[in-house]
Structures are given as C-alpha cells and as structure tokens.
Amino acid sequence: MNFPQNLKYTNEHEWIRVEGDIAYVGITDYAQEQLGDIVFVDIPTVGETLEAGETFGTIEVVKTISDLFLPLAGEILEQNEALEENPELVNKDPYGEGWLIKMKPADASAAEDLLDAEAYKAVVNG
C-alpha cells in the first residue's frame, strides 16, 4: 500500500496536497482498495464554500455509496472531469490522475494539523 510522504491525510481516508493557495483532494490507496471498483463519482459542491469535515461528494461502488469529507475549510473550485468517463482512475492512480477536487483552502496552514504519512499508516494498520 502506498503512503506518499508529501501528502496530508484524514481519519476518513482522504488525502490533500497543498500547492501554494490551491489544494488537490482525493481518497487514499487504502480507501480505494477497501471500496473496490468505483463506478461513479458525484461532486455536486463545485463553487460552494464548505467547512472542514463537511461532505463534498460521494463515491459509488457496485454495492454502496460512500461520502467524501473535505479535509480543510474552503471553496471547491473544480472536480476532476476525467472521472466522469473514467471513474476507475481513482482505483488505478488515487494520488495522481484519480484526484477528486481542486479547492482553495480558507487557511492552507491548517493542513499541518492533519495526519502525516506515518500517522495515517498507523490508523490503517490499527
């Protein structure tokens, strides 16, 4: 299982990569593995400003739908349009082409309070 060191993580299995005043959000390798084959990603919150921990969308797999939680407060700028035609990108490349949203964090420094790779690995391994 992959735990990139340059990302921050949540207990709900989302990752965030801050690049200046923009951040990318996705689900972790562990999450996609546990979910199974992703068939649909729904991000109805583009253009909205949400608080950390709020639901920003859902991921649908063959037998269930899972909520997606925002790691930091901020505005959802765009969703990954490639997932409309190819939702399996989340399974194939969760930290790269399978990113879910691009956002503008209200306070990007708040990412420092999230889990680093080692702390997230401890969550996954129980």
Curated annotation (Swiss-Prot):
Cofactor remark: Binds 1 lipoyl cofactor covalently.
A matching Pfam family: GCV_H
UniProt keyword annotations, A-Z: Lipoyl
GO annotation (BP), single: glycine decarboxylation via glycine cleavage system
Keyword Calcium set for record: no
Gene3D superfamilies: 2.40.50.100
Keyword match Lipid metabolism: no
Sites bearing N6-lipoyllysine, chain numbering: 63
Disulfide bond sites: none
Superkingdom: Bacteria
GO cellular component: cytosol; glycine cleavage complex
Record-linked SUPFAM superfamilies: Single hybrid motif (SSF51230)
Domain Lipoyl-binding residues, every copy: 22-104
Family as reported in the entry's similarity comment: Belongs to the GcvH family.
Protein task: The glycine cleavage system catalyzes the degradation of glycine. The H protein shuttles the methylamine group of glycine from the P protein to the T protein.
SUBUNIT field: The glycine cleavage system is composed of four proteins: P, T, L and H.
Protein name per its UniProtKB record: Glycine cleavage system H protein
